[in-house]
Amino acid sequence: MEGIKQTFQRCKAQNRAALVTYVTAGFPHPEQTPDILLAMEKGGADVIELGVPFTDPIADGPTIQTANTIALQHGVTLQSTLQMVRDARQRGLKAPVMLMGYYNPLLSYGEERLLNDCKEAGVNGFIIVDLPPEEAVSFRQLCTRGGLSYVPLIAPATSDARMRVLCQLADSFIYVVSRQGVTGASGTLNANLPELLARVKKYSGNKPAAVGFGVSTHDHFTQVGAIADGVVVGSMIITTIQKAAKGEEVKAVQEYCSYLCGRNFEQSAHELNMGEALEAAKEPVGTATVDGVITEADIDAQLAALHGTIPKRFGEFGGQYVPEALMDCLSELEEGFNKIKDDPAFWEEYRSYYPWMGRPGQLHKAERLTEYAGGANIWLKREDLNHTGSHKINNALGQLLLARRLGKKKIIAETGAGQHGVATATVCAKFGMECTVFMGAEDVRRQALNVFRMKLLGAKVVAVEAGSRTLRDAVNEALRYWVVNLADTHYIIGSAIGPHPFPTIVRTFQSVIGNETKQQMLEKRGKLPDAVVACVGGGSNAVGMFYPFSNDPSVKLLGVEAGGDGVDTPRHSATLTAGSKGVLHGVRTYILQNQYGQIEDTHSISAGLDYPGVGPELSNWKDTERAKFVAATDAQAFEGFRLMSQLEGIIPALESSHGIWGALELAKTMKPDEDVVICLSGRGDKDVQSVADELPIIGPKIGWDLRF
């Protein structure tokens, strides 16, 4: 921390802005990183940000995403990143080094261990993109105790009230994001940057402010350096490395840094003359007095006051692990949701669309499935009969009505199987709102029918080629897009995932499933069901079915995840069955990750369940043992698909088929006078081609042959 402070003080004494440079650890190769750090310093860098690679860097543009991917392919971990710092220090690196990145790899490493190892390796502090101060209380305390810096970020969207608190938190400098959006070099600077910096300086006192995002040329450096204490350059350094001839990367970095700032190491590492030394050693004149002391507890209380009243956690799960640019937008969303959740006029409007949606939904006994299982009565809650063919319409309509009250004109969504995308495109068509749906390229391939349905409805469909090209990657791109377009765009997230208040919003609109089930079972059976069953991906239909029964201990809650090829293989999506606690897409929950906190690729025959995370409320129900979760393999899901089709004349979605298999297994263990309700979350016409494609492989496992 002190090293960073002294660096900014020295730059100020020399009447210049500090050059803060970024490179991803292990890019282009781990062996080159210490040389690149030294080259940055020789080229005039005053402070160095070393990026810790992560599989899902939602705040970064394509350039740094690529660098992360390459570093991970080289096997770079947090441990090896710290070794790179040690190696550079041993070879003479003097510049302060900040670790920059995302929280999950750090959380996986262990906060206390991380702080100790970082201090020993020669790291000076942290810039953690998705760890806002509200979520970093213990981490900040550890940093303070260890003399390491926690650098807050401020974005153009940050309100004055929030900015005031963030500036108080800063212990070395403040990182100012020059524009809304993701990282990346640009041809022009934000024209509103002087105004943004003026706002920052209003609250920052004498704390330095360094500006990043979009700086790429010497002119940019000069312009920003004239009004800021530091200038951050990252993406253009990655690009410089990419463009350099093999073996010339280190030299190219040094030359680029020198070009940016017009200086080099020889100019900046001069000996202090006697006058400078005496000036630096002077005692302050008079006795220093203070008018008050602001403690960490005071700051935490101020942060809490910026938020609404809805609890943002379910036990230890939930929270808002997002880039600073989203924080005030989420507060706006929470405030808007608070206004409508208990407003009779809103719910009257919502229910006025029931005839269009196909609600109230149907519930009936599955006679032949019951006979087949030979145990409890099996009932079907028919969300597949809703308009658009799934439960997704419940949430899409509710969030669109909320977005209109917030004054948003455009809607974005992510989708896996396409059902949420279709539901969102449908409500946007009805209300005349522009709609963009992000969908993994692999899901576009296997759900081509739903892609065409979305386009028929007037939506724009963006295929995401990054990563595993599935739902997780669609969420990443949707979040990146939203950060850029907060002013006029609402993100209708499709599952009970994401940062607070999204899990609560989605649960609220999906609870119509469980509320109707409870009422209908009382009418038909005069009692509550003994168990309710739902498939689980992100958890939207499960949380909607389970929540109304969560305080009824006589009702078992069973969630059925995607077991893929089996949870004893790497090819599954069974997050609650086989995952561990971590942070993904803005929320602390169970996730599928490796030992280094990197997110694992997943597999399911069902695109809608092919996701490495799950809603935080479901995670809490798992830990408190309120709900039980099991996994059904692809073959077992096919068995559920076949039985529902051939015994009840209902072709279910492959997602729902997982729940069907789990419910049948449960019903077999129960008494004939007991009742199990399955949430039949969607219809299966979208999956017929997938079943036909996979049947030659899976069919023999379950004795099912439909070849002509």
Swiss-Prot record:
InterPro entries assigned to the protein according to its UniProt record, in alphabetical order: Aldolase_TIM, RibuloseP-bd_barrel, Trp_synth_b_CS, Trp_synth_beta, Trp_synth_beta/beta-like, Trp_synthase_alpha_AS, Trp_synthase_suA, TrpB-like_PALP
EC number: 4.2.1.20
Reactions the enzyme catalyzes: (1S,2R)-1-C-(indol-3-yl)glycerol 3-phosphate + L-serine = D-glyceraldehyde 3-phosphate + L-tryptophan + H2O
UniProt-annotated stretches for the region Tryptophan synthase beta chain: 306-708
Sequence segments annotated as region (Tryptophan synthase alpha chain): 1-305
Cofactors demanded by this protein: pyridoxal 5'-phosphate
UniProtKB keywords: Amino-acid biosynthesis, Aromatic amino acid biosynthesis, Lyase, Pyridoxal phosphate, Tryptophan biosynthesis
Domain of life: Eukaryota
Active site per UniProt: E49 (proton acceptor), D60 (proton acceptor)
Regions annotated as coiled coil: none
Pathway: Amino-acid biosynthesis; L-tryptophan biosynthesis; L-tryptophan from chorismate: step 5/5
Gene Ontology annotations for the cellular component aspect, listed alphabetically: cytoplasm
Gene3D superfamilies registered for this protein in UniProt: 3.40.50.1100, Aldolase class I
GO BP terms: L-tryptophan biosynthetic process
MF terms in GO: tryptophan synthase activity
Top EC category: lyase
Record-listed N6-(pyridoxal phosphate)lysine modification sites: K392
CDD domains: Trp-synth_B, Tryptophan_synthase_alpha
Family assignment from sequence similarity: In the N-terminal section; belongs to the TrpA family. In the C-terminal section; belongs to the TrpB family.
Name under which the protein is recorded: Tryptophan synthase
